[in-house]
């Protein structure tokens, strides 16, 4: 939807690598793959959309697209642990969701996260995800990503 197009548009504007642009476009596809209500977080349910999204994306796209999708929630938990100002910028709904997802990770978990070769890509995707919440933003149409998308297919 609109959020995904904004994230991908911002990735293009920042000159991100193709895998990040495509991951930005697909990172929340897991929300479309489950049957949970939109207010699942308010009901105390973590929809695990990053895992559902990863399974779908990993089936069709290169690992360097799929892995940041899988890690984009972990990247939020990582940033909350590493950057107090990041945690301070989260909206009330984001804080509710953060706690459902397990809250900020420990120092040991941070070190483990940093061992993943795609952790920097995941953090970059997370920052794009956070910025892609502007009402009525002018964005590139979905069709403009066709070449990038096909280039990242398995």
Model-identified regions with their sequence ranges:
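A positional/architectural concept
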Residues: 1-3, 9
